[in-house]
């Protein structure tokens, strides 16, 4: 089922002349940096959809995960949403959330997030009356402790 040629290039389109090609900053970087095609201002506590003006065709059996950049995370900037489905072909947008205390400016050409390609499995779902029990059971949200 996972017959995927990892050497096949991923096709993308620059929708406008403002778009920058996604790039990796090192040979072993997990993600490709995505760039803002426009200038935006994000006040503290607010969020903004940032357009890249890039559209692309995801590899078969993969989806694109939009992940934060560590340098922006240090400034209180996070990502909302973050999934690009295999069959999506539109302008890739990134929701930036300003959790900081200062207004955050996004300049045209700024690196705003990273795109990571991940394999996906499309299971068939089956409703049942109960699930197999485990030692953990329904314990979640901190139930395993800090240490």
Curated annotation (Swiss-Prot):
Q: Which domain of life is it from?
A: Viruses
Q: What induces it?
A: Expressed in the early phase of the viral replicative cycle.
Q: Which cofactor does it need?
A: Mg(2+)
Detail which positions bind Mg(2+): 24
GO MF assignments: dUTP diphosphatase activity; magnesium ion binding
Task: Give binding positions for dUTP.
Answer: 68-70, 82-85, 88, 93, 95, 111
The EC code for this enzyme is: 3.6.1.23
Which family does the similarity line name? Belongs to the dUTPase family.
Q: Which PANTHER family match?
A: DEOXYURIDINE 5'-TRIPHOSPHATE NUCLEOTIDOHYDROLASE
Tell me which NCBIfam families the record gives.
dut, PRK00601.1
> What is the name listed in the Swiss-Prot or TrEMBL entry for this protein?
Deoxyuridine 5'-triphosphate nucleotidohydrolase
User: Which species does this protein come from?
Assistant: Camelpox virus (strain CMS)
């Amino acid at each position: 089922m996972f017959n995927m040629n990892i050497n096949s290039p991923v096709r993308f389109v620059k929708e406008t002349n403002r778009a920058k090609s996604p790039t990796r900053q090192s040979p072993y970087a997990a993600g490709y940096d995505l760039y803002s095609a426009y200038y935006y201002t994000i006040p503290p506590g607010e969020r903004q959809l940032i357009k890249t003006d890039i559209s692309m065709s995801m590899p078969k059996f993969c989806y694109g995960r939009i992940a934060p950049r560590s340098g922006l995370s240090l400034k209180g900037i996070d990502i909302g949403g973050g999934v690009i489905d295999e069959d999506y072909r539109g302008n890739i947008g990134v929701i930036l959330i300003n959790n900081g205390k200062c207004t955050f400016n996004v300049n045209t050409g700024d690196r705003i997030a990273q795109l990571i390609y991940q394999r996906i499995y499309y299971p068939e779902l089956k409703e049942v009356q109960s699930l197999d029990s485990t030692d953990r059971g329904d314990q979640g949200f901190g139930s395993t402790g800090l240490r």
